């Protein structure tokens, strides 16, 4: 029996409707964006088709509909969503199609190799992962972790200072994830911070010593 749920961190799942055998319509939760992240169980060996329905054409378009340039021959392929069997290693679906109809729909299908799978719009970066990263670097002598204040939902908005002189006048300021569609920029900034504090690059060390 196939089961859907959104009972985990970072999840977003609306109403699920079974249209036919191994064919499901997924309603997205109403919000100002288009975040999608849910779990499916009981899917090993089954080819399942998913129809994601959006509340507006704008949301469907933001999945990356391509413009063929020819209104008589539109290209309805779109940005492929991701799936993961462990919530850590992610893969694109082979194909996805978007249908600008009523309701606005993005459809994709896949034959799964494991019983449990996570499906999302793009690779997630969770708040608990952020806290784990900050905890790992907080005691490094070149790192200072502070809070700029709370977010609208009460979480800390962290700022990480890297260098021997936190009060230096000349600074480089990096911002990541200005909106919810940029979680991979968090990973890029993690890599940059790790490189800065690794102490394995003479040029980086010299730059930090000059700050």
Predicted regions and their residues:
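Structured catalytic-domain cores with a bias toward divalent-metal coordination
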Residues: 1-211
């Amino acid at each position: 029996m196939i089961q859907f749920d959104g009972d985990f961190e970072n999840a977003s799942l609306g109403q699920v409707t079974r249209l036919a055998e191994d064919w499901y319509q997924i309603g997205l939760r109403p919000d100002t964006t288009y975040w999608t992240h849910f779990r499916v169980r009981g899917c090993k060996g089954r080819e399942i088709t998913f129809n994601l329905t959006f509340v507006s054409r704008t949301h469907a378009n933001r999945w990356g509909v391509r413009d063929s340039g020819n209104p008589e021959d539109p290209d309805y392929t779109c940005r492929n969503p991701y799936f993961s069997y462990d919530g850590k290693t992610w893969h694109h679906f082979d194909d996805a199609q978007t249908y600008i109809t009523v309701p606005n729909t993005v459809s994709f299908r896949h034959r799964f190799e494991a019983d449990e799978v996570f499906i999302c719009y793009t690779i997630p970066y969770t708040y608990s992962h952020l806290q784990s990263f900050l905890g790992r670097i907080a005691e490094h002598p070149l790192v200072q972790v502070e809070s700029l204040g709370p977010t609208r939902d009460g979480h800390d908005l962290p700022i990480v200072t890297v260098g021997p002189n936190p009060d230096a006048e000349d600074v480089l300021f990096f911002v990541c994830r200005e909106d919810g569609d940029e979680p991979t920029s968090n990973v890029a900034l993690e890599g940059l911070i790790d490189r800065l504090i690794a102490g394995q690059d003479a040029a980086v060390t010299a730059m930090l010593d000059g700050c």
